[in-house]
Amino acid sequence: LIFVAHPKTKPFLMIAAIGAGILIVIVAILAVYATNSDNFRIGRITTWLDPEGHSDGTGFQVLQGLYAIGSGGFFGKGLGNSTQKLGMIPEAQNDMILSVICEELGVFGAIVVLILFGLLLYRLMFIARNAPDLYGSLIVTGIFAHIALQVILNIMVVTNMIPTTGVTLPFVSYGGTSVLFLMTEMGLALSVSRRIKLQTE
């Protein structure tokens, strides 16, 4: 939010670049020493690097999710016809829900879900850019960042692009508290949107 509110972006970009470099070095060091540690966080990294080697343990959920995505094909098996969710994918209703969507509705269904998220994020960006004051703009920018980050992290976990994080898919994954907070955020965004007065010629 400070990045959005501040007129100069160069210092923040430099900090982000330095942070990314440090993160890469840390991940490389962890990858080297991961095999000698029993820490479950390190175990997530080793599972991410070699899920097949941990198929009986920590890699089971990731592999079953990937099998579900692969078995769905382009149009899927049909709504409600997933077999992987019936005990094969642990906690399929939570952070692995996208793999079930891919199995039942295929790549086409997953693309539709991503397009809907894209439209929501586009609308939030529009509201943030046209908000009548900085306070409203920052509120909606925070909501945008929260939802976008959750969607990106969830997709990357399901496709095994990053280690498992436990981040759920907004509005789709199981969880009443999550939905309550997301709906509160949508209410705040709509409140800011109501006060936008676009100039018409």
Regions found by a protein language model. Give the residues of each.
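Structural signal for the C-terminal ends of transmembrane alpha-helices
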Residues: 1-9, 118-128, 189-196
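Short loop segments and helix-boundary regions at transmembrane helix junctions
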Residues: 3-15, 134-138
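Hydrophobic alpha-helical transmembrane segments
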Residues: 12-17, 111-112, 139-140, 180
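Hydrophobic, glycine- and aromatic-enriched re-entrant/interface helices and adjoining loop segments
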Residues: 15-110, 132-135
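Transmembrane helix-loop junctions in multi-pass membrane proteins
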Residues: 35-37, 93-97, 121-129, 155-161, ...
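Transmembrane helix-bundle signature of multi-pass membrane transporters/permeases
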Residues: 88, 100-103, 143-147, 175-178
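Hydrophobic transmembrane alpha-helices and their immediate junctions
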Residues: 107-151
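A juxtamembrane structural motif centered on a specific transmembrane helix
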Residues: 150-201
